[in-house]
Amino acid sequence: MTISDKIRIYELSRDLNLENKDILDAAQKLSISVKSHSSSISVEEAKKIKNLINKKNSDKQILSINKPSNKKDNYKQNKEDKSPVISSVKGKPLKDNSNKKQLLNKPLNKPESLKVIPNQLKNPNKPNIYNSSQSQANLTNQNTKSKPSEHFNKDKKTFRNNTIPPIKTPAKPPIQLIAKPKNINNNLKSNESSKNIPNSGDKRELSLKPDQNRNKPKPKNSNNRRNTPELVGAPIRRDDPNKQNNKQNITFKQTVSNRPGTPNRPGTPNRPGMPNRPGLRNKPTDQGRPGSFNRQANPNRAGAPNRPGMPNRPGLRNKPTDQGRPGSFNRQANPNRAGAPNRPGMPNRPGSRFNSQKSTGIRKPVSPNELLQLQKTNKSEKDTLAKTNNQKQNIESPKQKAKAPASRPNAVPSSKKPPHRPFSNSSKKPGRKDWDDSAKLEALRNKNPQKQRQKVHIIGENDDSLTSETSGYSGEKISILSASLARPKKEKSEESKSHKSTKQFKKKKKETTRQRQKRRAMELKAAKEAKQVRPEMIIVPEDNLTVQELADKLSLESSEIIKSLFFKGITATVTQSLDLATIETVAEEFGVPVLQDDIQEAAEKTVDMIESDDFDSLIKRPPVITVMGHVDHGKTSLLDSIRESRVASGEAGGITQHIGAYQVEFKHESKKKKLTFLDTPGHEAFTAMRARGTKVTDVAVLVVAADDGCRPQTLEAISHARAAKVPIVVAINKIDKEGASPERVKQELSEKDLIAEDWGGDTVMVPVSAIKKQNIDKLLEMILLVSEVEDLQANPDRSAKGTVIEAHLDKAKGPVATLLVQNGTLKSGDVLAAGSVLGKIRAMVDEHGNRIKEAGPSFPVEALGFSEVPTAGDEFEVYPDEKTARAIVGDRATDARATKLAQQMASRRVTLSSLSTQANDGELKELNLILKADVQGSVEAILGSLEQLPKNEVQVRVLLSAPGEITETDIDLAAASGSVIIGFNTSLASGAKRAADANDVDIREYEVIYKLLEDIQLAMEGLLEPDLVEESLGKAEVRATFAVGKGAIAGCYIQTGKLQRNCSLRVIRSDKVIFEGNLDSLKRSKDDVKEVNTGFECGVGCDKFSSWTEGDIIEAFKFVTKKRTLTQ
């Protein structure tokens, strides 16, 4: 003690012979503020702690379970000891707030004290397991006139007793609540094998109703081993030594649910309503056990509860029902007792008999999840309980469906497998509802086999001692059990089937790392094998591909593409985008031609012009022939030869950069046949125009020069014709020229799967000369033969459908479109929709300029009357009224605007390389253009060529591109945006020139596409910053030095070139540059001069260098600017 009458925690623990943590725990429970073992408390607080610890020690003595002794006077019930009744509570069942599951690792050698708390339910830890042989003698001397009571020992907490009258109606039985201490392990420290329970005044008796207490028996205490609940190691069986006719006394651990939805906990004492224990045959049941209600087993007692889910325990035959068990309420087992509560979820134990009624068999322990499901079904399926009970009786037959009792968690594994308990069929008790849910439990388990968890057997540390105390309880006498009790073999096979069914629900094992690596290696190997075959042609979408995409299209590894680019001086990664020129260069290296995706789509025929209604009125129509080939191979000359011989003289045949549509007549087999020819440009910029020509054609004439062979546009034309699925007729031109080799052309075409007929193929090849007009008639005959095979037909009696071949804006006529009628007849005044353009035919002229009123199938005409210039390649169709056509045009215009916006955004596309350039130079340079051309095809050709220009450092941005003349509106747009106006084969509107001069707008006009593209490239290069290049001026040798003031002058002799004042110089000594700077002073004979030429002497001075030495070499140079190019 200290001076201030304070006590330290460690002093108090030393006085009480306890540890510091026990004192700290007690202080915490008493709300005494202490921090550590060195904290001080007052004397009053120390007394409180002592009282609490003494109370705990007394509780521990009460809680310790003694081994029952053979004395008869161990327990004497005091008649005056009356305990309040814990009865069922009206209303909803109380919930258990305790979520902890407790497990006893040590045997309980003393009876447990149960703490009774109203409105709260404590789950038991472990059911009591009795030795039936030791307890049978104790059940014979009970006084039947004594009051029934159940003895509860004190817990470490005080008891609160709440007596509530029982419920009269047993329809929904409420729950009897018996709480137990939270931590029994903390209270069990003694392992004594035989102690008597003190018969003190601290004992509490829990009785039933007062009127029943007077008539119920009081247990005797002489030699009653049933008075002490005892835990044994395992649910094993042994013979009863006092009854020779009983060959199986089986202890059984039954899991009992206290309330709906609450999991059962092991280690609880027997409570009111607990089933009679197995193995007590021929025992009188009129003797109550300590701490239990003694109820007589009168099945006709009014109002007795039938507890659902509690199967009767086996082996309780011929047992009087006036005796209870120790540790439980001794009550009369009268099922018809009025007002007795019926507790849901409490199954009757199997094997017990009421009025010689058979039990329903042993059931497996119920898991909490299964119990919840059972209670839900009990609430929702009251009308099917009888049917469920019948199923249960059928399932649990004694011969086929025997079930083994579940092992207790702390069970010690025995050396021999105990035989299994037989089942006996039982009928429903009279006057009681069938609350048994065994069938439902079996159905749930069969329905959800994957939810069955393997039971874990936990071996307690004192299980060995418990087994030894039972004197060989588990081992030696099992062999004398009847062999009929063993589980049938059929059940084992069914169990194995059920195990197999549960395995089917298991998920597949995850793929291991080794398996995944092996699978990936096989996939890579298969991909490499697939990539060994090179494609004939690759299609490039939107003019760009990444390196990885290009490698996939070429069936190569990406490393091969990167290596190829590296040798060309281009550093690229697999995700970097490549422009069309680079793609073509790489593809050409691997021998694969390149075709743009939009061009491929443009060549495909999208609309079938003949409908099902036209089949009755079809007639033959003239074929449409498209002349295709490489530039300068003689396409236009060939067509001119055909037209000059078939068309009236004097017709102008200006075939330049447009599609020319012409119709000629040819006499074949004494009949005049009409042929419609479309001439397409051969320049590479007009790919889209060639594709449109192929789209509407019936026969493709491929012109190949005999002296030049197959060229890139030749291969492109072949791909277009194949995309359109039209037959190809090859005209080998220029056979009259020196060096012509038609056989070489046939060889090259055969490599492209175009094999001549004389070589065994099916491709018609005609050698012709357009200049000398050789074999022209033969070519036309072959075209007619091929077209007849195609069986070309159309219906002239319907409204017209066709394709826009070309369109342009005429200064006098307005929008003009060249239309090719493919089905029906086009008439003046028809309302048509061409793409997103509405038109009403005001006039039509043929290729000769003659006005016509109607045009039949395969007839090309120029039509006037469109609201704006239609897009070349769009299909047109005539509609009955303007309202219908306008509605269709409105929908198409919305889509056209979205497409145009996407194209404008694409024109400003910035690649990875251009972004790096922008980061280095500080700003991305742009060249703004406004493009106006004569026809739509020229606009498309120019835009396609601009896309192929290098855009790494300068981005070309086309603000406006349209056919027609240059207007003042275009000038205003150019002035606002700083753009250059490009005009191709067009003119300026009135006032446009004056507006351009006023706003200082640059207008460039061109007639040839080569010059236009060249000037645009020069303009882009002009935006680049020039490079500084070093230019050498001359050399001089230092022959003398002169000291002037603080510096020095070098006397030099000019060897080559000249020296200029303020130029840059480099001083070299012993082949090493020792100084580089500016030439500040240059003198000759003491006079300052601007330059000194070869062979003269001069004096050279530098402000920053004065250590001249004879023999030094001075190199003079200057920096000049050099224009950069886009290719660098």
Swiss-Prot record:
Pfam families: EF-G_D2, GTP_EFTU, IF-2, IF2_N. Residues 499-519 have a biased composition (Basic residues). Residues 620-792 form the tr-type G domain. One of its GO terms (cellular component) is cytosol. Residues 120-146, 243-267, 386-397 have a biased composition (Polar residues). GTP binds at residues 629-636, 679-683, 733-736. Residues 733-736 are annotated as: G4. This is Translation initiation factor IF-2.
